Amino acid sequence: MSGLNSIGLGLVGDIGGTNARFALVDFDGADPQLIEPTSYKGEDYGTAEDAIEHYLAKMGLKHPDQAVVAVAGPIEHGAVHFTNSDWKLSEDSLRRAGGFRTARLINDFTAQALAAPRLAPKDLRQIGPLQTSGEGDLAILGPGTGFGAAGMVRRHGVETPLTTEGGHIAFAPFDDTEIEILRVLIKRFGRCSIERLLSGPGMEDLHVILGEIEGRKVDELTAKQITEHAVAGDDCCKVTIERFCAILGSAAGDLALALGARGGVFIAGGIAPRIVDLLEEGEFRARFEAKGRLSDYTRAIPTHVVMNPHTALIGAAVAMTPDGRAAIS
């Protein structure tokens, strides 16, 4: 792409278990602006660095000033081994790949948390009767290739993201069917986290397990096929998605309690926008609120689905600003 000058431009990325998204960031205005956000399939590249180099070559840009890349996995000593892929990436290898002056990795849901307070109404789909008030702490969570979670602490005008690995907390069954689901998964894995169900691979397992429990034969389908068939009205797949939405509601409510997210819960990730109508129609909100003695607490918390696919890129751009750097330092 001609006409771009590397001065004042940065690269932001969002790399998960399936997709790698990149954009350039222009800091000329009051807020950072994304330029040419682009998504690639991770399986098309040998390494994360290959994908980054391909994007920069496509944009015709050499040596942007800085990079912030949001990654799906815990970061230790400036490096990540992705939880749901074989890729590895470090801040040093990122810096070398793009010729950046500075390069930083942040957790993908930390990026989601940085973006959440800045999302416009068009970026969100309200689930339930309440709208966000702009006050109170937030929880940001959601299923994709894995399950991510983060918090946003807001005090006296200062926003501080809380990085977590909340997708790996234990799955807590709600009824007899979910107890049977848990038994199957414990036999298979020894321990069952919410990510074992609330993810693309988890949805595929859930579909087969529900068929076994209910004594009906089901085809082994991908998560994409299950969601598409459910939205189209397929009864078998709709049962799976309804259960998926219910379990997601329970997990979201648990994380809202754990993070004290009275300001709102944002459901992000690649799956929720594709099933948003079923989330709204099903038991998601009822299960979110069903917290026994704390049900009044969760009943007062707004829930929204994040519909903008570039939210983590927005959050990575925020991390480049002085306030963002201070928040995650």
Curated annotation (Swiss-Prot):
Annotated ATP binding sites: G13, D14, I15, G16, G17, T18
Gene Ontology MF annotations: ATP binding; D-glucose binding; glucokinase activity
Catalytic activity: D-glucose + ATP = D-glucose 6-phosphate + ADP + H(+)
Predominant cellular place of this UniProt entry's protein: cytoplasm
Enzyme class per UniProt: transferase
One biological process term in Gene Ontology: glycolytic process
EC number(s) stated in the UniProt entry for this protein: 2.7.1.2
Alphabetical list of CDD domains matching this protein: ASKHA_NBD_GLK
Compartmental location: Cytoplasm
Keywords: ATP-binding, Cytoplasm, Glycolysis, Kinase, Nucleotide-binding, Transferase
One Gene Ontology cellular component annotation held by this UniProt entry: cytosol
Family that this chain belongs to: Belongs to the bacterial glucokinase family.
Protein name in UniProt: Glucokinase
